[in-house]
Design a protein with these regions (language model features):
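Solvent-exposed, non-transmembrane regions of membrane-associated and secreted proteins
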Residues: 1-169
């Protein structure tokens, strides 16, 4: 199958600096896939970018053994997330965050001329009646964007900075 370069089903990796996520992306969204990482929604563009593409990546919330997309609700508009694929890093800047019914798929469609990636998880936590959609628009991956993503990682999910865990000398 396409993009199965590592022969283990991994087609890419998704990185979300704000919430300290770095997860493998697998083909499909079966329970088996979602138990171990992020799934690429069949029928959407492969996560390789390009004009008039829209890849959709889905991950679980609240798994006891893995956080995956548990903290996705902490991502903010303007945040950067990255897709690492084929020795390339694709950067996306979050431009839309919304909660929809599971049957509402209009926001996952290709928009001619645009390169979008949407991260999807169930919400609210423990009820899972709706879907949280975090969409990013492709932006050039420059040193500035890399620095911006690193800054978001430092701020952490609540924007207050990561707690210092070093013990005093």
């Amino acid at each position: 199958s396409a993009l199965n370069l590592e022969k283990n089903g991994i087609m890419a990796y998704v990185e979300i600096p704000r919430i300290d996520v770095y997860e493998p992306v697998y083909h499909g969204t079966s329970e088996e896939v979602l138990a171990k990482g992020v799934g690429h929604l069949e029928g959407t563009s492969l996560p390789i970018g390009g004009e008039s593409t829209h890849t959709v990546l889905s991950g679980h919330t609240g798994l006891p053994e893995a956080e995956i997309f548990t903290k996705l609700e902490s991502v903010k508009e303007g945040d950067i997330f990255l897709i690492h694929v084929l020795n390339e890093t694709l950067a996306y800047k979050v431009d839309q965050i919304k909660v929809v019914e599971p049957s509402e798929t209009d926001d996952l469609k290709i928009v001619p001329g645009y390169d979008y990636a949407t991260l999807v998880t169930c919400t609210p936590y423990g009820i899972n009646s709706h879907r949280l959609l975090v969409r990013g628009i492709r932006t050039e991956y420059t040193q500035d964007v890399s620095d911006e993503a690193a800054g978001q990682a430092e701020e952490g999910p609540d924007g207050a900075g990561k707690q210092c865990t070093k013990k005093p000398l």
